[in-house]
């Protein structure tokens, strides 16, 4: 389980909670947010995410990642100012966690 301010991601039972309430989230979105949040502030390219979340045998379009990120943002937008799902232009995505200092 990965926890941040107002967010809990439990991959064991595929449960995403925002403010303590379960948010309906498809399996790949769960796996994607879990992967990003488990590696805070690390930038992943679309290809890395496809390999690491979808698997090496995935032959779909890399824009699949964009669609899943968009859907996650719709669920998580404005929940906390301590973390955010960020686009790193020209590179990929990261789960950005603010420094507590």
List each model region and its residues.
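A short, conserved alpha-helix in the catalytic core of glycosyltransferases
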Residues: 31-37, 66-73
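DNA-binding patch around the recognition helix
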Residues: 1, 24, 69, 73-101
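Short, Lys/Arg-enriched segments at the junction into DNA-binding effector domains
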Residues: 1-43, 47, 96
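Short helix-coil junctions and helix-kink-helix linkers
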Residues: 52-57
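Alpha-helix N-cap and coil->helix boundary residues
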Residues: 44-48, 60, 64, 80-83, ...
């Amino acid at each position: 389980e990965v926890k941040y301010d107002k967010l809990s991601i439990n991959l064991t039972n595929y449960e995403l909670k925002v403010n303590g309430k379960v948010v309906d989230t498809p399996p790949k979105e769960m796996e994607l947010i879990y992967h990003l949040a488990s590696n805070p502030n690390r930038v992943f390219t679309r290809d890395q995410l496809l390999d690491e979340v979808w698997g090496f045998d995935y032959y779909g379009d890399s824009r699949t990642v964009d669609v899943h990120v968009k859907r996650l943002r719709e669920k998580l937008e404005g929940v906390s100012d301590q973390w955010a799902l960020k686009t790193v232009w020209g590179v990929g995505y990261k789960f950005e966690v603010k420094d507590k200092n």
